[in-house]
């Protein structure tokens, strides 16, 4: 899994039936210091993540399976909304803090 920040939504009214009901988000991956990387991805979201939230993103075959719904044509799936990230030097992220 990777840390990412939600930058926005992607709307696609015409898509494969396997993606019906799956919200699509534009996410930017984060490094170990919480800084944005130059990598972006469109990820499916079934957990209800919102703009600017930090999320956990599963990629590859793990992204294609969720709750026994079979394979979905996804390379990335938001599988969790992050509340806090703590490292040896202290708090890296706290959802309650402003400015993130």
UniProtKB/Swiss-Prot annotation:
It is found in: Carboxysome. Coiled coil: none annotated. GO terms for biological process: carbon fixation; photosynthesis. GO terms for cellular component: carboxysome. Residues 1-83 form the BMV domain. It holds the Pfam family EutN_CcmL. Belongs to the CcmL/EutN family. CcmL subfamily. The tight homopentamer forms a pore with an opening of about 5 Angstroms in diameter which opens into a wider tunnel at the base of the truncated pyramid. The pore is positively charged. PANTHER family: BACTERIAL MICROCOMPARTMENT SHELL VERTEX PROTEIN EUTN (PTHR36539:SF1), ETHANOLAMINE UTILIZATION PROTEIN EUTN (PTHR36539). This is Carboxysome shell vertex protein CcmL.
């Amino acid at each position: 899994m990777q840390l990412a920040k939600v930058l926005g939504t992607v709307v696609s009214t015409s898509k494969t039936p396997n993606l019906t009901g799956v919200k699509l988000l534009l996410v930017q991956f984060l490094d170990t210091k919480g800084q944005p990387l130059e990598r972006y991805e469109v990820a499916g979201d079934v957990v209800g993540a919102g703009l600017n939230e930090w999320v956990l993103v599963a990629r590859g075959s793990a992204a294609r399976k969720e709750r026994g719904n079979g394979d979905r044509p996804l390379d990335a799936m938001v599988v969790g909304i992050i509340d806090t990230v703590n490292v040896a030097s202290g708090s890296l992220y706290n959802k309650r803090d402003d400015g993130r």
